[in-house]
Amino acid sequence: MDTVGQYLMENPEEALRLDVKTDPGAVRSQALLCGIGPGARVLDGGCGSGKTTAVLCEMVQPGGSAVGVDFAEDRVRFAKKTYGDTPGIEFALMDLRSPLNALGSFDFVWIRFVLEYYLEGAREMVENVSRVLKPGGRICLLDLDYNCLNHYPIEPAMESVIHALVRRMMEKYNFDPYAGRKLYTHLYDLGFDDIEVHLVPHHLIYGELKESDDFNWFKKLEMASSKARDVFDGYPGGYETFRKDFRQVFNHPRRFTYSPLIIVTGRKPS
């Protein structure tokens, strides 16, 4: 079976996971770094639950608007139900790999935590979405580097399984744990001007574990492990023991986990 075109995290609770994990304050800070402000028309590509679209829409008031697009009917339905009454917002069922001209043109195109699911095809997606960006408009790419890989302290056997699981997701499900480091080069190669790069922490987990982080990380583990259960065969006790051991480590306030977020923005030539 060809799994490269499948979304790694696809499951009935994905809209909820995305909604729970999205921090409006972090979105605002990141959008300010990209220059998003009042009066702009913004495309939120891969909008998921619509929560980020709603934050962006709030930031472009007065006079602005935001359009969120996603290829999953259930997520667009969730977004419309939860955030569709926000003035200036709309949601559409569309694939970022397909023509987007029907949406019109935008001052900003925002692509956050999408390219990590496109080890193959990320650059082509960026090129496609840039076609609806106005001349002089800015594209905003935001993604993680070393995604899910940085935990301390952790036993070598557990770390080995995590790395093997991530490799399997790369090989079979088009996942890219190093998407962040590639964003600048995407824009450079596509001829964008005035490229700016910012590096900030995203996952920065220490001390007591937040309920939202617990839900997000164990939903990730559940989804990835369901696609590669054999990866756990070499771990003493198999998957169930690994899950129990990882929960014990991850819930301990001594644990330190982080993932860097790379933000790259560039101006489309006039």
Model region roles, listed by residue range:
Residues 100-109:
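A short acidic, Gly/Pro-enriched loop at the edge of an enzyme's catalytic core
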Residues 2-25:
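Class I SAM-dependent methyltransferase Rossmann-like catalytic core
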Residues 140-209:
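Conserved catalytic/acceptor-binding region of the Class I
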